[in-house]
Amino acid sequence: MTPPATPLTPTLQLAHDLIRCRSVTPEDDGCQELMIRRLEAIGFKTERLRFGEVDNFWAIRGGDGPILAFAGHTDVVPTGPETHWNNPPFEPTIIDGMLHGRGAADMKGSLASMVVACENFVARHPNHKGRIAFLITSDEEGPSINGTVKVVEWLEARHTKMTWCIVGEPSSTTRVGDVIKNGRRGSLGGVLKVKGIQGHVAYPHLADNPIHTLAPALAELAAEHWDNGNEFFPATSFQVSNINGGTGATNVIPGEVTVVFNFRFSTELTDAILRERTQAILDKHELKYELEWILSGQPFLTPRGDLVNAVVDAINTATGLDAELSTSGGTSDGRFIAPTGAQVVELGPINATIHKVNECISAEDLNKLTAIYERTLEILLA
């Protein structure tokens, strides 16, 4: 017997419409216009903000008072060969209660839940307290240069500050709402080039092998105890992601070796301290080197307060779960918003299939997520 079809609630219908847009980063492909039309229909004032090849928008509703912002991205990662998918990735399909499609979990499902939650809330509270806002970009899965960070700069120039911000990243692990990300580690990358003298492997005395001279320093960096972490963050980690040296020939000592590495660091350290300690180790080994640093984001933490308490309460009301607060995982656009002074959390669907072939999410989870967002609005702004 064929199982009954999953009814398309307003959230699921909007999620379908968004997934149909082929918004591979940095393309938006009409997602934002779909959202803008819905938001303007309930009284939001919107500003389309294009920086470079990236579409962004800021939408706000309400006269004055604290701002509760929903932040998210319409861009998705590439699908890979579409033939590897069970269903075309941009043709949303519900199978056995699971909504399939690129972006279903990351993060078009969250966007649909946010919009419908606001529609429901405004219908009941047309004269709500404070303000509701949306900060949406199509540059989160890419370099993140012309997206949220630029919108935040634009807001700061207008002296507009978010009070609370919910980023719709897929934070949940096994049940929707089981985990809230209330902070993230910082990310500091480095590209290290160590110089040597190229030569023949049979005549090492006429060359200087940079791989050999680098090895002890690299071993020390890998073994270094950077900090102990704290109650909110694990200890800082150092990881090498790439090593490249040599000409491709088996009988040539390379003249240069390049190492790419990354720190994920806690609030116990600053990026300046990490740079100083790294360079001290390299200098101790008397390497001839060049080092380029890339700071992707500072660590941030939103302790228990208005926003965290509201979201925890909303999750418990909608699902019965007691959410876990976590700072694990990679970086998100929350790193650009937290430095403004806003309280920031990430709350979204289950992340088990994000960036994978056959990305999918429970259809019912999106309805629950809508209820969670709606309840959060009630607590903070009703």
From Swiss-Prot:
It catalyses: N-succinyl-(2S,6S)-2,6-diaminopimelate + H2O = (2S,6S)-2,6-diaminopimelate + succinate. Binds 2 Zn(2+) or Co(2+) ions per subunit. Its cofactor is Zn(2+); Co(2+). Pfam families: M20_dimer, Peptidase_M20. Zn(2+) 2 binds at residues 106, 141, 355. Keywords: Amino-acid biosynthesis, Cobalt, Diaminopimelate biosynthesis, Hydrolase, Lysine biosynthesis, Metal-binding, Zinc. Homodimer. This is Succinyl-diaminopimelate desuccinylase. The lineage of its organism: Bacteria, Pseudomonadati, Pseudomonadota, Gammaproteobacteria, Cellvibrionales.
